[in-house]
């Protein structure tokens, strides 16, 4: 949760302010409907129409940019999910007494990045990816039950952050790309 807040406020707020030349307050106010929908549905794919509407109508992003960036982001921008899964793998490894070496952490990190790109933007889409990572880390199968039981709580925040990242990317692209 703390990493989500940091990423949402500091990273995306800073990108919008310094790269997108837009007030972070205006940005976060404008995207609130999409962020709340993402939080409630746990689906970045279901939030695509609302995200497009927010960035086009409230932030002045062109349809050309939002029509590419929002769906692409909903498909491959799963960085918050990747962060949550990394923390969960290390938490469960410590809780189960599984020693994860530095080299294994690097392998898990690389696999996590690849798996997060392939994670579907639907509720619970990260469960299969987590199962693969848990197996790689040598965690017992019982951790899946615990992970599935808390996944929705983590998924709500992670999906919200992913969708905010998609919209922040649109604002930055609008500033950086000349559409003449």
Task: Please place each PLM-identified region on the residue numbering.
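Short, small-residue-biased leader/transition segments that mark boundaries at the very start
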Residues: 1-6
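Alpha-helical transmembrane segments of multi-pass membrane transport proteins
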Residues: 7-11, 19
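Helix-loop junctions at the membrane-solvent interface of multi-pass transporters
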Residues: 17-18, 118
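Transmembrane helical segments that form the transport core of multi-pass membrane transport proteins
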Residues: 18, 23-24
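Flexible, glycine/charged-enriched surface loops at secondary-structure junctions
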Residues: 24, 61, 66, 160, ...
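Membrane-interacting alpha-helical segments
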Residues: 29-32, 36, 40, 154, ...
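Helix-loop-helix junctions within the multi-pass membrane cores of secondary transporters/permeases
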Residues: 33-116, 170-171
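Transmembrane alpha-helical segments and their short flanking loops
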Residues: 86-180
